[in-house]
Amino acid sequence: MNEQIIMLGTGSAMVTECYNTCFLLKSKNDYLLVDAGGGNGILSVIKKSGVDWNSIKTMFITHSHTDHILGAVWVIRQISALMNSGKYDGNFNIYCHDECVDSITAICNHTLAPKFLKNINTKIFINEVKDGEKQNAGSIRLTFFDIF
């Protein structure tokens, strides 16, 4: 079976017994991370999933609520650290709407060390998407749409 969904979290904003809603979509050897939850718990749930960080090349953030976006900073930090140590191949793309781009960029700029920030816009790309836009996430074809 080539396609799979790996649930990393199923909880809402104020969970204490599980992680916030986020998941990995697998197609062939590509993984797409959808949302990142509310903090550094994303690191342990990905570790528990057994998925190699090097196989996650794309992340999609649905909206900028804290329980969906704050884990993104930890994902960026982890992938940047792997890039810096030569353990991550290629680029990492994040897709989200304009408000998320601004939020992720601001949080990263205020919290991450320069050694992690240096990969943003060179190897880690935070891409704004518009309603109806299409992108490839490895072998997964995405069509973005606005529900508001």
Model-derived regions: residue spans:
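Conserved beta-strand hairpin/beta-sheet module of binuclear metal-dependent hydrolase folds
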Residues: 1-49
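Short beta-turn/strand-loop junction motif enriched in small, turn-promoting residues
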Residues: 10-13, 81-82, 147
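Short secondary-structure boundary/capping segments
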Residues: 15, 24, 50, 84-86, ...
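Conserved strand-to-helix beginnings and helix N-cap segments that scaffold or border functional pockets
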Residues: 19, 72-73, 107
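Short loop segments at secondary-structure junctions
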Residues: 27-30, 80, 99
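A generic "binding-loop/recognition-motif" signal
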Residues: 38-39, 65, 100, 131
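Active-site metal-binding motif and surrounding structural segment of the metallo-beta-lactamase
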Residues: 40-95
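Metallo-beta-lactamase
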Residues: 90-148
